[in-house]
Curated annotation (Swiss-Prot):
Modified residues (Diphthamide): H603
Localization, UniProt: Cytoplasm
Binding site for GTP: 28-35, 94-98, 148-151
Chain ranges of the tr-type G domain: 19-260
A Pfam family: EFG_III
HAMAP family xrefs: EF_G_EF_2_A (MF_00054_A)
Statement: the UniProt record of this protein carries the keyword Protein biosynthesis: yes
The protein's name: Elongation factor 2
Reported function: Catalyzes the GTP-dependent ribosomal translocation step during translation elongation. During this step, the ribosome changes from the pre-translocational (PRE) to the post-translocational (POST) state as the newly formed A-site-bound peptidyl-tRNA and P-site-bound deacylated tRNA move to the P and E sites, respectively. Catalyzes the coordinated movement of the two tRNA molecules, the mRNA and conformational changes in the ribosome.
Length: 727
């Protein structure tokens, strides 16, 4: 039996021992060394050859990733590590650090219980470090810290032992500050990264060595020894004495929770059902014999097997051939194959039990974030939807060069939308174009070139990238009458800005898009009140949609309940296109204050009520001082001081705002905010301005009001592009 086959047998045995499982991720800012770390962990565990590790990037098994040298999708692998005389199963997920692929990070966080946060010793804590940490803590995923590229501090920056320790302390303090700020209340102190107990490791993933304080005490290696090994170019010897995989996986096993421990506090966070029900208790206990409950964290498309769903099981067991039920899409499915991940390969196993991460085929309608259960015991409600820190801010129009490819293109676009719920796909019925919205230029490029071009074999024409704008209101409208086409039904409404605290709760994912069939559910009402909505209004919310809300403030109108669903539909249609540039509306509250209906139901059907509400909502929004909002990005530039002026000039030329500046040694760090519309071509420009000597990164930071003097011009450009008549 080969080494790999033995590994598979061990994995099968350990899957049943909860206290010996760790579901963990590796996450970091782009290029801080996540994938190199993952590869060397695999090599140490005997999954790939040691000679190739670091160069092989086994988890970057997509051609596009290998070519760009960055991780685009989150990859999964299971491996075994021995610690304290016992073997442990480690299910490892490597996540992307590039801001355009943040959706994959969010989805991966749902699958794991602990994370190794990788931070480059040279660059320190960067924006994406903060973002991935925020996502981890939001999902109650416990972090430990690995400070990477320590050899560069010694060989390139020539730091003394005192300076080295100072640099480490600064990074640890910054990470701990973020944990204190963002961790759930009960873990703010417990989850701090403490050097002495070994929750922090230092090393070089590329050169395959790492140390931690407990390991130094055990092995007798000191900081001075490390400096000597690095200066004498003997990092190979250091890797034999302090192997990376041993130090990092020991830290993970000692400090990250097993599924049994983690599910006790994670389940109430991601599932809002009855904690006292059988399924509630079973998930908290991670019971393999309980009712089935799992969540799809990723869809991977395989040329031979079709769509493969990566799934974290919280309760129960899945065997090959089992009937399953998908709660979100309300579809039945069958588990055709049940496997574990081994990098790019999958190894079939007879069954998978609670607490593990597995690969399932046969779930054709599943999307990332989908809840999986048994058709005989349906999980109501499903798991909380995955909320992303970024939003799609750039749209391109694509058309198939050959019309015969059109059906295939539509199928591929559907598949992409299922795989990645940060992509929006829309079909413009009038022009026949397909619109794809993504997180940034790179995200869109990977979709059009790789997913459609390379994998789908379809040649497409891609339009110029278009920035996604939004509309909102700054005032309150007068009472507006919405009249049905037959003039027999009238609804009276007022548009006003949504309460700031309520909208902030919506953006943070504390309240969701939801239709309330009869009246607001008790859980929904409690969340709204907690977010700051008036208690009387919270009871009467009819629907929340795309960050807008409609509240029924009428009294004693009998027919209103019958017309409820039609009113909600009219409201949704009304906020899909704003009055300025037909962009989506956000942050609007519609108060329905009165209504009169025809007593005969035949005269108050969908063709009458929906348009009455739609026109009323649009009119109310138009009379409430509407404004355009544009997407913004936080831009961080790390540049030698000589080029600081050039970096600032580049920001200022793009309508940017400098928020903060710091000096660190001979480097300057510029923090700024720039509209997405002004960021095209920034990569080349900033490289040119600083002669390629700067590091920079961007992150979506929300929508802000377009300057008043630019609004008419931008609104006109959007209207002209959409073929709408000018205002």
């Amino acid at each position: 039996m080969g080494r790999r086959a033995k590994m598979v047998e061990k994995v099968k045995t350990l899957m049943e021992k909860h206290d010996q499982i760790r579901n963990m991720g590796i996450c970091a800012h782009i290029d801080h060394g996540k994938t190199t770390l993952s590869d060397n962990l695999l090599a140490g565990a005997g999954m790939i050859s040691k000679e190739l590790a670091g160069d092989q990037l086994a988890l970057d098994f997509d051609e596009e990733e290998a070519a760009r040298g960055i991780t685009i999708y989150a990859a999964n692998v299971s491996m075994v590590h021995e610690y304290g005389g016992k073997e442990y199963l480690i299910n490892l997920i490597d996540t992307p650090g590039h801001v355009d692929f943040g959706g994959d990070v969010t989805r991966a966080m749902r699958a794991i219980d602990g994370a190794v946060v990788v931070c480059c010793a040279v660059e320190g804590v960067m924006p994406q470090t903060e973002t991935v940490l925020r996502q981890a803590l939001k999902e109650k995923v416990k972090p430990v810290l690995f400070i990477n590229k320590v050899d560069r501090l010694i060989n390139e920056l020539k730091l003394t032992p005192e300076e080295l320790q100072g640099r480490f302390m600064k990074i640890i303090a910054e990470v701990n500050k973020l944990i204190e700020k963002m961790a759930p209340e009960e873990f703010k102190k417990e989850w701090l990264c403490d050097v002495v107990t070994g929750k922090v490791a230092f090393g070089s993933a590329y050169n395959n060595w790492a140390i931690s304080v407990p390991y130094m005490q055990r092995s007798g290696i000191s900081f001075k020894d490390i400096i000597d090994y690095c200066e004498q170019e003997k990092q190979g010897e250091l890797a034999d004495k302090a192997p990376l995989h041993e130090v990092i996986l020991d830290m993970a096993i000692k400090h990250l929770p097993n599924p049994l421990q983690a599910q006790k506090y994670r389940i109430p966070n991601i599932w809002k059902g009855d904690a006292e029900s059988e399924i509630g208790k079973s998930m908290v206990a991670c019971d393999p014999n309980g009712p089935l409950a799992g969540v799809v964290t990723k869809i991977i498309v395989d040329k031979h097997a079709g769509a493969i769903s990566a799934c974290r099981l919280f309760s129960g067991r899945i065997k090959q051939g089992d009937d399953l039920y998908l709660v979100g899409s309300k579809q039945k499915a069958r588990a055709q194959q049940v496997s574990i991940f081994m990098g790019a390969e999958r190894v079939q196993v007879p069954s998978i039990s609670a607490g593990n991460i597995c690969a399932l085929t046969g779930l054709r309608e599943a999307t990332a974030g989908e809840t999986v259960c048994s058709p005989s015991e349906i999980l109501e409600p499903g798991f909380e939807s995955l909320t992303h820190t970024s939003e799609p801010v750039i749209t391109v129009a694509i058309e198939a060069k050959n019309t015969k490819d059109l059906p295939k293109l539509i199928e591929i676009l559907r598949q992409i939308a299922r795989e990645d719920n940060t992509v929006r796909v829309e079909i413009n019925e009038e022009t026949g174009e397909h619109l794809i919205s993504g997180m940034g230029e790179l995200h869109i490029e990977v979709i059009t070139n790789t997913k459609i071009g390379r994998d789908g074999g379809i040649e497409v024409d891609v339009g110029e990238p278009i920035v996604v704008y939004r509309e909102t209101i700054t005032g309150t409208s007068p009472e507006i009458e919405g009249k049905s086409p037959n003039k027999h039904n009238k609804l009276y409404m007022i548009a006003e800005p949504m309460d700031e605290s309520v909208y902030a709760a919506y953006v943070e994912g504390k309240i969701h898009d939801e239709d309330y069939k009869k009246k607001t559910t008790a859980d929904g009402e409690a969340r709204l009140v907690e977010a700051g909505l008036d208690k009387d209004q919270a009871k009467k919310v009819m629907s929340i949609y795309n960050g807008n809300m409609i509240v029924n403030m009428t009294r004693g109108i009998v027919q209103l309940d019958e017309a409820r669903e039609l009113i909600i539909e009219g409201f949704k249609e009304g906020v899909r296109n704003g009055p300025l540039a037909a962009e989506k509306v956000q942050g609007v509250k519609i108060r329905l204050v009165d209504a009169t209906f025809h007593e005969d139901a035949i005269h108050r059907g969908p063709a009458q009520i929906i348009p009455a509400v739609r026109f009323g909502v649009r009119d109310a929004v138009a009379q409430a001082k509407p404004v355009l909002l544009e997407p913004m990005q936080s831009v961080y530039i790390n540049t030698p001081q000589d080029y600081m002026g050039d970096g600032m000039k580049e920001i200022n030329n793009r309508r940017g705002q400098i928020l903060d500046m710091e000096q660190e040694g001979d480097m300057s760090i510029i923090k700024s905010s720039v509209p997405v519309a002004e960021m095209f071509g920034f990569a080349g420009a900033i490289r040119g301005a600083t002669q390629g000597r700067c590091l920079w990164s961007v992150e979506f930071s929300g929508f802000e009001r377009v300057p008043a003097e630019l609004q008419p011009k931008i609104a006109k450009q959007i209207r002209d592009r959409k073929g709408l008549k000018s205002e």
